[in-house]
Amino acid sequence: SIRKLHPKPRIDSINNGADDDGSGSMAVLEIAEAIMAMPVKPKRSTLFIWHTGEEGGLVGSAYFVKNPTVPLDSVVTQLNIDMIGRGRAEDLPGGGDDYVGVVGSFFDSKDLGETVKAVNAKQAKPLTFDYKFDEPIAWANYNNIYGRSDHFNYARAGVPIAFFFTGLHGDYHQRSDEAEFIDYPHYQKITNYIKALTVEVGNGPRPQLNGTKPAKVKPIG
């Protein structure tokens, strides 16, 4: 695998962020274009948002939740995509060809969690879901993934969320987070799945909250 090779030394100090979060940002764009091209659109409108200032403490999503462009109570689900370009075994323990971490879906809404699973089961080759970061006990340390991406502010506002990511690899927040190390077939598979999930949520009943909000979990960014 090309990801086993160390990138050549570079004299600049720029973190290009191919996986974090070029992968998520471009997946949102691809899903938006795919849904726009559908002859029959989902019954619900789909709002595609690129939040800024995530690394500074989820600034952009906090602003949007306070200043939404649509009534916030009309938002039935927030699907967050942050770092979905890696996830192979050489990237992180427990990784694999079909690996993806799923965070928050069952914690916030059993309805949404079941939809996330059901759509995956319909795929030609289902993804392997990792729910280890969906446990509250995992939120107390550095790997507090639930509180470290933009879905968090929506969850605090009472919007059911599901967050997809493929793990914290050795190139995370490093100059070596380059496009040459992205696992493109894996990345495409996850993006196609999230597109299918977006359509399903757009056509299905509104997911009901479990009655839990993560108000006591501090965002990290």
Task: Please describe what each predicted stretch is.
Residues 31, 36-41, 57-61, 65, ...:
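C-terminal soluble interaction/assembly domains
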